[in-house]
Regions:
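N-terminal subdomain of nucleotide-sugar transferases
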Residues: 1-52
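Short, structured helix-loop element that forms part of the nucleotide-activated donor/catalytic region
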Residues: 230-256, 267-271, 343
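Aromatic "clamp/platform" in nucleotide-sugar-dependent glycosyltransferases that forms part
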Residues: 283
Length: 379
């Protein structure tokens, strides 16, 4: 089978045009790792860029890479039509069996549905939900992304829903859905945890209202002041926002807090190794990678009972869940984990087994092939 994967090259997104090798979002990257283990498939990764960059022709023996430069006018101002048309011309030359657009945040979904080939989309962030929550106030980004998401949902052959939450959001708009979680980068399965002597809680995510880091600090303040734990925050945010300023004020006034900023995947692996537990107090999420990655790394995971999280965690079996609106539940969950080593060990072991069984890259890649075959068989 010949497959086109449309995904964002984060060199372009982050302004790292000097790098000579592409890097992608954690979920698409892990999926490509899985495809690399299936030699009888041919994968072509296409990423649009606003500047020319040096790039390898192949990412693996069976995975080709195409960096496609598109002029500035072909991006958001044209509703990504320039990206879609340039990609369409290249896809015709490749002549794939199927096209897979990764995400509705930017250009990839439009490129897939306008490709002229059988196609599916994966919804990573639900743009219509973000727009309804009025995130990034003062910006039209989410409103535009939500409108394009709706258009693409109606035009695609189907959606790979990475959670039941997303399936329920899109199933009335799109012809077909398949429920399949993200894959996890294989490096996290190799971690051997060695937690710090003082319990270290790891938060991974954007420093903003939706992920709720301020709520986490306030809930845990008694534990932090009693020197029962520390919290490390791996992520960044809008330093001009009121939320960031409140977060920074707490960072300066409450003991035991550390801001790591945005860190590499290798550095994140080291943080998993040191962590006593991983916490995600989010108010809304689809298939949060930190939950999957923490489980793969063999670290106990506690997360909000919202969005797609209940698909990933079996409460009291391979993780713990809580209500993010109730600070006492966040605090009680963390207290249980930092004080009960037997509980941590049991949940970490079960979580790791779940990750190997359900989130390993090769397993997820093979299930994607089944989805592609479903699409082709229905034509």
């Amino acid at each position: 089978m010949r497959i086109v994967q449309l995904t964002t090259d984060n060199r372009n997104q982050h302004g790292r045009w000097d790098l000579e090798h592409p890097y992608f979002g954690t979920a698409p990257e892990a999926l490509l790792q899985g495809f690399a283990e299936i030699p009888d498939v041919e994968v072509h990764v296409i990423s649009c860029t606003s500047r020319p960059m040096k790039s390898p022709e192949k990412l693996a023996p069976n995975i080709h890479f195409h960096s496609l430069r598109v002029p500035k006018l072909g991006w958001g101002r044209s509703l990504f039509l320039g990206c879609a048309m340039a990609t369409r011309r290249l896809i015709r030359k490749i002549n794939p069996d199927i096209v897979h657009g990764q995400g509705t945040e930017r250009d990839c979904a439009m490129e897939a549905v306008l490709s002229g080939y059988p196609n599916v989309l994966t919804i990573h962030g639900n743009m219509r939900v973000h727009a309804s929550r009025e995130e990034q106030k003062g910006s039209s980004y989410y409103k535009m992304a939500a409108a394009l998401e709706t258009l693409c949902l109606k035009r695609t052959n189907g959606v790979v829903a990475i959670s039941t939450y997303t399936r329920e959001l899109v199933e009335k708009l799109t012809p077909r859905t398949w429920l399949l979680p993200n894959a996890v980068d294989r490096r996290y399965f190799k971690i051997e945890p060695a937690p710090d002597p003082l319990p270290r809680i790891l938060f991974v995510g954007a420093i903003g209202e939706r992920k709720n880091p301020v709520g986490l600090i306030k809930a845990c303040e008694p534990l932090l002041r009693a020197r029962e734990c520390t919290i490390a925050f791996a992520g960044d945010g809008d330093e001009n926002s009121a939320y960031w300023k409140e977060f920074k004020s707490l960072l300066d006034s409450v003991p035991g807090l550390e801001l790591l900023g945005f860190i590499s995947r290798d550095a994140l692996g080291e943080e998993f190794r040191r962590a006593t537990l991983v916490i995600l107090p989010t108010f809304e999420d689809n298939c949060p990678m930190v939950v999957l990655e923490g489980m793969a790394a063999g670290v106990p995971v506690a997360a909000s009972r919202v969005g797609g999280v209940p698909d990933l965690i079996r409460h009291e079996v391979d993780g713990l869940m809580f209500d993010p609106e109730k600070p006492e539940q966040i605090r009680d969950t963390i207290t249980r984990l930092i004080r009960d080593k037997e509980l941590r060990t049991r949940i970490a072991r079960a979580g790791n087994e779940t990750a190997w069984r359900q989130f390993h890259p090769k397993i997820i890649a093979e299930k994607h092939l089944g989805i592609y075959q479903d699409v082709l068989a229905a034509r």
